[in-house]
Design a protein with these regions (language model features):
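Copper-binding active sites and cupredoxin-like electron-transfer domains
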Residues: 1-210
Length: 210
């Protein structure tokens, strides 16, 4: 990295393919696979329906950097399930393959720095918003390049827009205790219809659901 367009391989059914590359520019990257012929972000085939979860992250750290055991990676995806026998595409948003209320709850100590790598592997924009705190965007990149080496790109935010195929490295400090959310701020992405289970209406809720 940085890379050029079209650095992909085609794997036929039943084939295996082994590849290697030099870890170049430090940053947050991901790999993906699709059987689709639809064109999506950066002119690449668009993952759709059953292949929307075929991706993974890889992080290139600067030479000599010690591993950070507290660092977390979050991959945003959209599961387009049109396997049902109707003409509707059923879209569910997810982080690391899970949709609320099944997403992982993270617990941190007050005053300790938190470091996240966030990857938008979906085909839609996601303005990612953190409740209660500002966070520092240390880099903002895409599948070809990352701005991790440029200090001029570092800035504070409460919401950072990630276009399809974009990534960011962020850090923040939980200065006050509480239960805080990190979510996409696109309204219809946080509607109950986007979740993997039926969310009860307010008048149907039991106190233990809150």
């Amino acid at each position: 990295r940085p890379a050029v367009a079209g650095d992909s391989v085609i794997i036929q059914p039943g084939e295996t393919y082994e590849t290697s590359f030099i870890a170049g520019q430090p940053g947050t990257y991901f790999y993906r696979a699709t059987a689709s012929t639809k064109i999506g972000f950066f002119g690449l085939p668009l993952p759709f329906t059953t292949d929307t979860q075929l991706f993974g992250a890889f992080i290139v750290d600067p030479a000599g950097k010690k591993p950070d055991p507290t660092e977390r990676i979050m991959m945003i995806s959209m599961w387009n399930n049109n396997i049902k026998f109707d003409s509707t595409t059923h879209e569910q948003n997810s982080i690391n393959g899970l949709s609320w209320p099944f997403t992982e709850r993270l617990t941190f100590k007050q005053g300790e720095e938190v470091n996240w790598k966030v990857i938008n592997a979906s085909n839609q924009q996601h303005p990612m918003h953190l409740h209660g705190f500002y966070y520092t965007v240390n880099s903002h990149g895409n599948i070809y390049k990352d701005s991790a080496s440029g200090k001029e790109s570092i800035h504070k935010a409460v919401t950072e827009l990630l276009n399809p195929g974009e990534t960011m490295s962020m850090s923040w400090v939980p200065e006050k205790p509480g239960n805080w959310l990190f979510h996409c701020h696109t309204m219809f992405h946080i509607l109950p219809e986007s979740f993997l289970r039926k969310v009860p209406k307010e008048d149907e809720m039991d106190p233990k659901d809150l």
